[in-house]
Regions:
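Alpha-helical structural motif
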Residues: 17, 91, 110, 262-269, ...
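Short secondary-structure junctions and interdomain/linker hinges
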Residues: 78, 82, 102-109, 116-124, ...
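Generic amphipathic alpha-helical segments used as scaffolds and interaction surfaces in large
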Residues: 100-119, 253-260, 264-267, 271, ...
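Extended, charged amphipathic alpha-helical segments
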Residues: 226-367
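C-terminal helix-loop subdomains that flank or include functional centers
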Residues: 317, 343-480
Length: 480
């Protein structure tokens, strides 16, 4: 019996890493909710209610600094400090506002993708189109309200895959995607999540050519997974697809091979720091509760004093028997856990974690600061390059559903590109002055000088376009 829920061995191997990164990036509440998974219980052999209560207090006092999540957000912010370049034909205009059918624009989809790459080193892009007849013109296309969509898939949701050699090319021949669909209850308010599996295949037709098919599996009445009707999508020209419009996206390359997440070492250190914090906060708790003691007394004195009230402090008389004494016992401070935590904090900063720490920049030389940025951006650059390539490929697949000949679309007419200029230079008055002087001399355009003054960045245009602007300004035809 076939089992659509079968998980690829590499998926099973990497799933714990992905789940750990999700928890750590989500923050303190998610980490603490997992209890002993990330914070082992002292005296775990003791199953008494008292020890359970002690562990809950130990867990509550622990402090989890959200370093990994902050680093991830910072790197995503660096990648999108400059707006991505997005070019598309009119048939794909909807992608600018709703790329996945759930309201996410292409920009937001790209941001989510970079975040997944940093956490999981992997995500999937899949393009589909409603099962309708291809429109013959743009007006008919808009009337149908059927648009190609680009779906971004979490690595956790792509549970199985396989590839084969076809015509001397390695192609994906199987992709199994776990999905959840919502169904509203009869009361109109309640909602249930129903699991299903979407299977993308390359399979031979009657002539031996491999074509793309889609089949959805749902749980039947007997609890077994039942495959629905197979669909064989076609492009705008009515031709079957000879490959699956799906790609894995990775931080090293876009192959199906899985690498370790780039934030995993930082997450492990973050959790180790969390455990040190728990021990340190435990010692702080006990240090803050000194124990009073009395010696040279008996129970009769204690009972009598208790009736009258025992008061300790300035201007208070406490009669003691002969040779009696009163004192305070306090636990010795445990500096070992604090020192271990501080060591790990420094290690996290050395690993390129972007901590929101005011004044930290003053403790670093320019070389050290640039080195930290280089470490982060070398990882981020790889993520961005591969995401750009995958998103541009997905755009071409989407275009193939609605345009007769996608080969005529060049990079100037169809592309998505996240900028790799992660460090904004910022506005420089001297540079603005030089641009103005160059414009006066006819070696640059006033348009470029104006845009730099407004944004602090050079306009993104080709040399030929700048030449046209200069000539237009000289002969008075510039559209300023």
């Amino acid at each position: 019996m076939s089992d659509v829920t079968f998980k690829h061995p590499e998926y099973v191997k990497n799933l714990p890493y992905w789940q750990k990164l999700d928890d750590v990036c989500e923050g303190e509440d998610a980490v603490k909710a997992k209890g002993e998974k990330y914070l082992p219980k002292p005296n775990a052999h003791d199953k008494t209610p008292a020890n359970k209560s002690a562990y809950l207090a130990y867990l509550m006092r622990a402090v989890f600094y959200e370093v990994t999540g902050t680093t991830s957000n910072s790197l995503v912010g660096a990648a999108f400090a400059t707006d991505p370049s997005f070019k598309f034909p009119p048939e794909l205009a909807h992608l600018e506002r709703n790329a996945n059918g759930a309201g996410l624009s292409a920009y937001q989809l790209a941001q989510t993708g970079i975040r997944h790459l940093l956490k999981h080193y992997r995500f999937g892009l899949y393009v589909d189109y409603p099962d309708v007849k291809p429109a013959q013109n743009l007006a008919e296309y808009k009337k149908q309200k059927a648009f190609p969509m680009i779906h971004l898939l979490n690595a956790i949701d792509v549970i199985n895959w396989d590839s084969m050699i076809i015509d001397n090319q390695k192609k994906l021949c199987l992709v199994v995607i776990r999905e959840f669909i919502s169904e509203r209850g009869a009361d109109g308010f309640s909602k249930t999540e129903i699991e299903q599996y979407r299977v993308l295949r390359l399979e031979p037709d009657s002539e031996g050519n491999y074509i793309y098919s889609v089949q959805v599996y749902k749980k039947g009445e007997k609890g077994t997974w039942v495959g629905g009707e197979k669909k064989f999508p076609t492009d705008y020209n009515g031709d079957f697809w000879t490959y699956i419009p799906f790609t894995f996206v990775g931080a090293i390359d876009n192959s199906e091979e899985i690498k370790k997440p780039p934030l995993l070492p930082l997450a492990n250190l973050n959790l180790a720091h969390y455990r040190d914090s728990a021990d340190f906060q435990e010692s702080v708790f006990y240090m803050g509760q000194p124990q009073f003691f009395a010696k040279g007394v008996n129970w009769a004195w204690y009972d009598e004093a208790k009736k009258r009230g025992i008061y300790i402090g300035a201007k208070v008389l406490l009669p003691l028997p002969e040779n009696g004494d009163l004192g305070i016992v306090q636990a010795d401070p445990n500096t070992l856990a604090r020192e271990a935590g501080m060591d790990k904090w420094e290690q996290m900063k050395e690993m390129g974690a972007r901590l929101i720490e005011k004044g930290s920049a003053g403790k670093k030389t320019a070389t050290e600061s640039n080195s930290d940025d280089a470490v982060q951006h070398s990882v981020l650059s790889l993520c961005v390059v591969n995401a750009n390539e995958a998103l541009s490929a997905a755009l071409r697949w989407a275009a193939k559903f609605v345009i007769s000949n996608v080969d005529v679309l060049t990079k100037d007419g169809l592309m998505f590109e996240i900028s790799q200029e992660f460090n904004k230079q910022g506005y420089q008055a001297e540079l603005a002055r030089q641009l103005y002087e160059a414009a006066l001399q006819g070696r640059s355009s006033f348009k470029s000088w104006w845009e730099y003054n407004q944004t602090g960045m050079f306009p993104k245009q080709k040399y030929e376009e700048e030449q046209v602007n200069v000539e237009a300004e000289k002969d008075g035809t510039a559209n300023l």
